[in-house]
Structures are given as structure tokens and as C-alpha cells.
């Protein structure tokens, strides 16, 4: 499942 927040970097989604 993908989060609503989609950052440019996949690793940035950890925050």
C-alpha cells in the first residue's frame, strides 16, 4: 500500500 505522501525520493518516505 502506498502512502498519501509521495516524495521525490522513495527513501524520504520513511519520515
Swiss-Prot record:
Which reaction equation describes what this protein catalyses? D-sedoheptulose 7-phosphate + D-glyceraldehyde 3-phosphate = aldehydo-D-ribose 5-phosphate + D-xylulose 5-phosphate
Determine the domain of life of the protein's source: Eukaryota
- Enzyme Commission number(s) of this protein: 2.2.1.1
The Swiss-Prot or TrEMBL record lists the needed cofactor(s) as:
Mg(2+); Ca(2+); Mn(2+); Co(2+)
Query: What does the note under cofactor report?
Result: Binds 1 Mg(2+) ion per subunit. Can also utilize other divalent metal cations, such as Ca(2+), Mn(2+) and Co(2+). Binds 1 thiamine pyrophosphate per subunit.
**Keywords linked to the UniProt accession:** Calcium, Thiamine pyrophosphate, Transferase
Q: Name one GO molecular function term.
A: transketolase activity
Q: Where are the transmembrane segments?
A: none
Q: Which family does it belong to?
A: Belongs to the transketolase family.
Q: State what this protein does.
A: Catalyzes the transfer of a two-carbon ketol group from a ketose donor to an aldose acceptor, via a covalent intermediate with the cofactor thiamine pyrophosphate.
Instruction: Fill in the subunit field for this protein.
Output: Homodimer.
Protein name (database record)? Transketolase
Q: Which organism is it from?
A: Populus euphratica (Euphrates poplar)
State the organism's lineage. Answer: Eukaryota, Viridiplantae, Streptophyta, Embryophyta, Tracheophyta
